[in-house]
């Protein structure tokens, strides 16, 4: 029986989960090496492999609590420690952590930050200080995840789409990206921007505003904002995000991206 079938049957209760132990171990190993991904782009569309999430959830059930020593520091967890970061060409600055079952391509730099199980981080990406890449999040190549950013994770429900950040995006300081949000290639989020499934993203660069939910288009320059909403007790300003400009090859190569962002009043 294939590993996928063993894992799906064990999660559904049709097979004793002990029978799936070796299948779960092999699957988490493959996630760790980057041979399998919880989500991947196929013909331009992102596909979620639910059974890999089930494998992670089963690993929590099957794993035994084990003391982990790091000098004078002691931890207690069910997941073993990743032990081949130098061989994978990944730089992790103490006390940063990439959890076993997450994969970072060569050239990734992780400052004192955290990358959770099931996540995938593309080559050349920087995960800056105190940033978090949540479980199963998919981060592209040459992405900058600035200090204090929270990239949400999701394991349940298994069919839920994880947060996806495409290649060359810039996620500014203290941004929050959760609930399966999709950040398009080359997009820029200004500092403190929050992107979730329920917060509107409003493009104000055209004659008429265009609203998005949980999706930032490629090359969009986005800042945090508010918009008025009227309730029986009065008018309040609720959180939203505004697309105020667009990144282009011209800005990157000739004018300079930083200069363009300053013109727009965007802080990173």
Model-identified regions with their sequence ranges:
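Structural signal for interior beta-strand "rungs" in well-ordered beta-sheet cores
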Residues: 90-230
């Amino acid at each position: 029986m294939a590993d996928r079938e063993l894992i799906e049957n064990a999660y559904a209760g049709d097979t004793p989960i002990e029978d799936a132990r070796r299948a779960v171990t092999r699957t988490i190993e493959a996630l760790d090496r980057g041979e399998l991904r919880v989500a991947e782009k196929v013909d331009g569309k992102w596909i979620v492999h639910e059974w890999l999430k089930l494998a992670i959830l089963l690993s929590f059930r099957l794993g035994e609590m084990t003391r982990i020593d790091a000098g004078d520091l002691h931890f207690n967890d069910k997941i073993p420690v990743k032990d081949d970061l130098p061989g994978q060409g990944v730089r992790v600055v103490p006390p940063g952590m990439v959890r076993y079952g997450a994969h970072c391509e060569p050239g990734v730099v992780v400052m004192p930050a955290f990358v959770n199980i099931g996540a995938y981080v593309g080559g050349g990406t920087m995960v800056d200080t105190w940033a978090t890449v949540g479980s199963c999040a998919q981060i592209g190549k040459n992405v900058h995840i600035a200090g204090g950013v929270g990239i949400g994770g999701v394991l349940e429900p298994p069919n839920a789409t994880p947060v996806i950040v495409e290649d060359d995006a810039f996620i500014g300081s203290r941004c929050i990206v959760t609930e399966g949000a999709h950040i398009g290639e080359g997009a820029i989020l200004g500092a403190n921007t929050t992107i979730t499934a329920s917060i509107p993203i409003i493009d104000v660069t055209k004659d008429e505003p265009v609203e998005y939910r949980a999706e930032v288009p490629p090359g969009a320059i986005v800042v945090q904002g508010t918009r008025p909403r009227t309730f029986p007790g009065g008018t309040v300003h609720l959180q939203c995000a505004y697309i105020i400009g667009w990144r282009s090859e011209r800005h990157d190569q000739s004018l300079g991206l930083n200069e363009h962002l300053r013109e727009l009043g965007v802080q990173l």
